Design a protein with these regions (language model features):
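Polybasic/polar functional segments that serve as interface/processing modules
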Residues: 1-121
Length: 121
């Protein structure tokens, strides 16, 4: 199915910010920004690591947002994948990705956009 997969590696995030260290805070941020981006949330799951760090996924009708934090390294990986089955959701994906980036304030960003599938595939 045609879609876009946005992948980020974010370096130099502030390791002690609550979004990096607490599952509930990161969950609230992800859910809020997904909704504000126009996505349809169908579920979510976040896990708190000890002593810190979070992994989480927001399931979207359009596909998903996944995020993993390593506060001890100031490092985050994030991916936003959307399918474009009946509607082009690419702008929503970009808006969500950039909103997450703005919230976590990385000093250095590695970014990839992968076009997935295709109607002619």
């Amino acid at each position: 199915m045609d879609g876009i997969h946005l992948l980020g590696e974010w370096y130099g995030c502030t390791g002690d910010m609550p979004e990096m260290t607490h599952a509930d805070t990161l969950r609230a941020l992800c859910v809020r920004l997904a909704a504000e981006s126009g996505m349809t949330i169908v579920g979510e799951r976040f896990h708190q690591f000890t002593p810190a760090g979070v992994t989480g996924t927001v399931l979207l009708a359009e596909s998903h947002l996944a995020i993993h934090t390593w506060p001890e390294h100031g490092f985050v990986t994030v991916d936003v994948y959307v399918c474009n089955y009946t509607t082009d959701n690419s702008a929503k994906a970009e808006r969500l990705f950039r909103s997450m980036e703005k919230a976590l304030q990385p000093q250095h960003v590695r970014f990839q956009a992968i076009h997935r599938g295709g109607r002619d595939a």
